[in-house]
């Protein structure tokens, strides 16, 4: 089997024909950032103005605010003046972590240039990019997870098994949030205080095709960016944006294991919830994990019980799960060595709910790190949880600036754990993932910009514009090589007489 060449699609390593075990999966993250310009505590430019300034070098160079970067990720300005990065196609957990972090670094570089431009124009101030999910006006923006899954799995079956996991997953990977109730808001019937999840109050349905007006936990819009007869794209929009690499690894890694089990037909318990939206909001405010939620069966269960059951199944699954291939030192899929720490941390977090002592994970889980930070400041200064100074600390935790952001300060002090080295992140900023279709897109874009060729690029297509141009479709996201793309790149030296563009 040679899935990297595109001769075969991903790996049915074991299992039956009806229930193959997929240990190689295309996945990606879409992250929207909050943005603001502040000088001496006062806002200077509005979000629209500062976002336009942020993207001005991109527009000047490529004549578009919607481009693919040389690491094959997509950078664009989303609705509501939110800068957004969609990572390139990844096929292993640590690879995705690296490209998620690379996205932070790329948009922060734009913010630093914007600050220089503001200073030269006499406006001044800092440009803050916040990797969070809510603003002071009550708006929410997301961190969307994308997983390529088998078309053979019925959507109804998938949602009934996956929704209980996603609703209760905030226990192990929420980003944490200070919340103050306001009339007409989803939190109006709750007390002010700290909650585990930033997104819980902004979900309105379990599953639907909407994304904003009636925001669901799982979005069903069917855009697989692959062979639609074989695959669908699972689009999860309930997750929080995480600053912690260990929390992100737990969020993605646990989901990978649950999806593998569902696809393989593993026996999982029936925890189908009677009301996912009521459950997700109640769970977000209970740090015991013992809030009883109603099931469709008429019984009740606690989020801790539900997560314990999924965790136990994942432990058993990992013991018998086949290893993916490793070709030329690169994993084609997520190996046990990356998933074993995920399952171990998952269990430790749940143990903390049992004991009520979260100190064993207070450098690894975002909501625990933030809660400790906020409660420490409140205790030292005698502050109520509604104090505006604590709200500022909450926001500054999500500032991605390497020197100024509070999470990064904690990491330098050894109070927040990490997984990746700086070299891995730098490499991900400059190069596309080597094991997926993204490698072709990255090579194509690099060559086009070197030779000054005008191009049009999207997830499944590469095109050289002009009278003598050519186009190649890339339907297989697992194929990292393609002779037609090689020919296109070789032809660029003769065609490069126009300005390069890379429109998404």
UniProtKB/Swiss-Prot annotation:
Pathway, per record: Protein degradation; proteasomal Pup-dependent pathway; Protein modification; protein pupylation
Residues at which ATP binds: 74, 87, 459
Pfam families in the cross-refs: Pup_ligase
Residues annotated as the enzyme's active site: 78 (proton acceptor)
Enzyme class: ligase
EC id: 6.3.1.19
Keywords on record: ATP-binding, Ligase, Magnesium, Metal-binding, Nucleotide-binding, Ubl conjugation pathway
Binding site for Mg(2+): 30, 76, 84
InterPro entries, per database record: Pup_ligase, Pup_ligase/deamidase
GO molecular function, one term: magnesium ion binding
Misc: The reaction mechanism probably proceeds via the activation of Pup by phosphorylation of its C-terminal glutamate, which is then subject to nucleophilic attack by the substrate lysine, resulting in an isopeptide bond and the release of phosphate as a good leaving group.
PANTHER family reported in the protein's UniProt record: PUP DEAMIDASE/DEPUPYLASE (PTHR42307), PUP--PROTEIN LIGASE (PTHR42307:SF3)
Free-text function comment from the UniProt entry: Catalyzes the covalent attachment of the prokaryotic ubiquitin-like protein modifier Pup to the proteasomal substrate proteins, thereby targeting them for proteasomal degradation. This tagging system is termed pupylation. The ligation reaction involves the side-chain carboxylate of the C-terminal glutamate of Pup and the side-chain amino group of a substrate lysine.
Family: Belongs to the Pup ligase/Pup deamidase family. Pup-conjugating enzyme subfamily.
Record's protein name: Pup--protein ligase
């Amino acid at each position: 089997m040679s899935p990297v060449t595109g001769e075969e699609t991903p790996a049915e390593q074991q299992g039956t024909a009806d229930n193959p075990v997929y240990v190689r999966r295309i996945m990606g993250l879409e992250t929207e950032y909050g943005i603001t310009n502040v000088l001496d505590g006062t806002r200077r430019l509005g979000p629209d103005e500062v976002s336009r300034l942020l993207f001005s070098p991109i527009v000047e160079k490529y004549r578009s605010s919607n481009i693919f970067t040389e690491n094959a990720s997509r950078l664009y300005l989303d609705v509501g003046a939110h800068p957004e990065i969609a990572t390139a196609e990844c096929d292993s957990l640590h690879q995705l972590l690296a490209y998620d972090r690379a996205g932070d670094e790329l948009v922060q570089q734009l913010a630093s240039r914007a600050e220089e431009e503001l200073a030269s124009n006499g406006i001044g101030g800092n440009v803050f990019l916040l990797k969070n999910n809510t603003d002071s006006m009550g708006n929410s923006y997301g961190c969307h997870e994308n997983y390529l899954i088998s078309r053979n799995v019925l959507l109804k079956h998938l949602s009934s098994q996956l929704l209980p996991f996603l609703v209760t997953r905030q226990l192990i990977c929420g980003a944490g949030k200070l919340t103050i109730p306001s009339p007409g808001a989803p939190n109006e019937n709750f007390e002010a205080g700290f909650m585990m999840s930033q997104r819980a109050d902004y979900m309105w349905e379990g599953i639907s095709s909407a994304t904003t007006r009636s925001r669901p936990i799982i979005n069903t819009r069917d855009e697989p960016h692959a062979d639609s007869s074989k695959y669908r794209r699972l689009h999860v929009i309930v997750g929080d944006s995480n600053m912690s690499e260990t929390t992100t690894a737990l969020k993605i890694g646990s989901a990978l294991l649950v999806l593998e089990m569902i696809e393989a037909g593993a026996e999982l318990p029936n925890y189908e919830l009677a009301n996912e939206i009521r459950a997700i909001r109640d769970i977000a405010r209970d740090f015991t994990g013992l809030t009883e939620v109603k099931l469709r069966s008429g019984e009740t269960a606690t989020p801790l019980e539900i997560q314990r059951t999924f965790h136990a199944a994942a432990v058993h699954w990992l013991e018998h799960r086949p290893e993916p291939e490793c070709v030329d030192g690169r994993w084609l899929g997520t190996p046990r060595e990356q998933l074993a720490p995920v399952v171990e941390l998952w269990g430790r977090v749940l143990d903390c709910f049992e004991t009520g002592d979260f100190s064993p994970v207070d450098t690894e889980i975002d909501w625990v790190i933030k809660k400790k930070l906020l409660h420490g400041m409140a205790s030292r200064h005698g502050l109520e949880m509604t104090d505006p100074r604590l709200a500022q600390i909450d926001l500054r935790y999500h500032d991605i600036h390497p020197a100024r952001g509070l999470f990064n300060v904690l990491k330098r002090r050894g109070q927040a754990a990490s997984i990746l080295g700086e070299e891995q992140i730098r490499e991900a900023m400059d190069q596309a993932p080597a094991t997926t279709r993204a490698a072709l897109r990255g090579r194509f874009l690099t060559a086009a910009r070197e030779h000054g060729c005008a191009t049009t690029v999207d997830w499944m297509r590469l095109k050289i514009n002009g009278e003598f141009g050519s186009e190649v479709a890339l339907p297989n996201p697992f194929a990292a090589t393609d002779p037609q793309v090689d020919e296109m790149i070789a032809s660029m030296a003769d065609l490069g007489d126009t300005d390069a563009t890379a429109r998404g």
